[in-house]
């Protein structure tokens, strides 16, 4: 049975310009919504905790045996462009064929529901 490490943002200080709460709040709502889908599809998961940081979440994931690491984060726009930047990037580890395939599958599904499908992309990264 596959097992993933689910890592929603822990950035409670990163408030959304729309007034809809923080990045931590919004990304945890997404993680909450994902959990029943994971379980109903036979996917086990471990989830980080709000008191953790990105670094401690990565360390915890690296100390375990997970098939996939799913980080849920959003990025802030530069000053003067608040509320103007939009899009989704599905990142994957460079050289990971399976990671790239997973990112492309996520992006494909997100294009179906995101209002700007041409702004849903994939990109390799190590940071």
Task: List the predicted regions and their residue ranges.
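Active-site-proximal helix/loop segments of hydrolytic enzymes
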Residues: 2-4, 11-14, 21-127
